[in-house]
Swiss-Prot record:
The keyword Phosphoprotein applies. This is Geranylgeranyl transferase type-2 subunit alpha. Coiled coil: none annotated. The keyword Transferase applies. It catalyses: geranylgeranyl diphosphate + L-cysteinyl-[protein] = S-geranylgeranyl-L-cysteinyl-[protein] + diphosphate. One of its GO terms (biological process) is protein geranylgeranylation. The gene is RABGGTA. InterPro entries: LRR_dom_sf, Prenyl_trans_a, RabGGT_asu_insert-dom_sf, RabGGT_asu_insert-domain. Catalyzes the transfer of a geranylgeranyl moiety from geranylgeranyl diphosphate to both cysteines of Rab proteins with the C-terminal sequence -XXCC, -XCXC and -CCXX, such as RAB1A, RAB3A, RAB5A and RAB7A. The lineage of its organism: Eukaryota, Metazoa, Chordata, Craniata, Vertebrata. The enzymatic reaction requires the aid of a Rab escort protein (also called component A), such as CHM. It holds the Pfam family RabGGT_insert. Signal peptide: none annotated. It is an enzyme of class 2 (transferase).
Amino acid sequence: MHGRLKVKTSEEQAEAKRLEREQKLKLYQTATQTVFQKRQAGELDESVLELTSQILGANPDFATLWNCRREVLQRLEVQKSPEELAALVKAELGFLESCLRVNPKSYGTWHHRCWLLGRLPEPNWARELELCARFLEVDERNFHCWDYRRFVASQAAVPPAEELAFTDSLITRNFSNYSSWHYRSCLLPQLHPQPDSGPQGRLPEDVLLKELELVQNAFFTDPNDQSAWFYHRWLLGRADPQDALRCLHVSRDEACLTVSFSRPLLVGPSTETLLLMVNESPLSVEWRTPDGRNRPSHVWLCDLPAASLNDHLPQHTFRVIWTAGNAQKECVLLKGRQEGWCRDSATDEQLFRCELSVEKSTVLQSELESCKELQELEPENKWCLLTIILLMRALDPLLYEKETLQYFQTLKAVDPMRAAYLDDLRSKFLLENSVLKMEYADVRVLHLGHKDLTVLCHLEQLLLVTHLDLSHNRLRALPPALAALRCLEVLQANDNAIESLDGVTNLPRLQELSLCNNRLQQPAVLQPLASCPRLVLLNLQDNPLCQAVGISEHLAELLPSVSSILT
């Protein structure tokens, strides 16, 4: 064995590493304690910079120590000469770069660099752009570096066209770069501002076509990369709908006026203001939500005094003015009539689809054909399938309804982990289509049975519905938004999986409610029905609660105003 190098055993190596770690930890704790002691004593000098450098050089994510360095640098600013300060800043920038090499995604390091450059009279922004380019060359998805680059570009007033060209170079090198795609979505509206384009900033047709060609190259190259699909969705996205007062309804029986809006809003003295004019005279009223809770809501209502509803005049004119939304709506209650209303048409306003020009429709049709071609090559690509569904919705939801449902089935099979989300999205689209069909038929009856619905959406659009059939679906609850259905008289929700009735409250006209074959377990879940003053028929057959002894007597006590309860 003489003359041979001794090799440490694994136990010896482990022990050596343990001792080394203990030594490093001891030095780390000692240095940290010294820094805190000096800070507490107000000894903010260059020795603190040296101590924090030792720690941050190994662990750049110690936020408190970056705060200490800033405090020291602020004190040294007034003590050092301009030449000494310039040398100190240069050294600090070099130290920061070394920290970034240790951890390129260190929040504290990037923030400290922003702070430091913000205090310089003439920062070298070109150097900072070069620094960003170097780090993005190593990792083009480093969003910390992207944030810093946006800061630098803003401070240096770099033209958006130059930054767009920079994203071109990175995307060309690697399509899978979410940050580059996102940056493009910020830059393009700046380069091509469009009047009345909305907050999302729609693009001119020629620019849109060029971007679509670029993103198509991306998802045809790597169909499974989601970044290009997200950008594609942004390109074809719709602007937010304009603020609008959708429907105004007046009921003589309930002495109530109800109004629905395009978005939830909070009405009050310090928030949104609604003005009510009756026969061109202002009327002071108190606004409330259907469920009585003071929170943002699509639907608001108010009580009307008897004088505004009497039959002495041939008609009464009601006008609601939404001051913040710059919108108003007027309806007339004729003599001898019990109700009057005025509403926007979902078919005319295209509430559930993009508002498209002829050129844009042509573009979307072309995109749909391209995605179908890709789907033939990649039949199990979930992003492609979802995009096809959304494009069909944007083009013509009723024309493509049957085909859309087929694509949903395929998508659920491909992506079973998101089956519940897809079921809810499918339910949303089916309800939208049903609202459109109801308006085309000009009726107040809505049949949503046998549609396999899992959720109810857009209930604020059903303000005037009198009969609603939700039977044979997969609903687990009737949501609080159901209180928006102020005209509802008959509700059928048989053969679902309903466990809660919290949403069936304060429905002033509800007379018949059928809940056969659901999952209502305890009589207490029926308590909300007591708030429906005209409810006379309740069908609870084939629910678990019907098996309880004495259930008929219990329900009669719980709901004394309901004359017929079937169990």
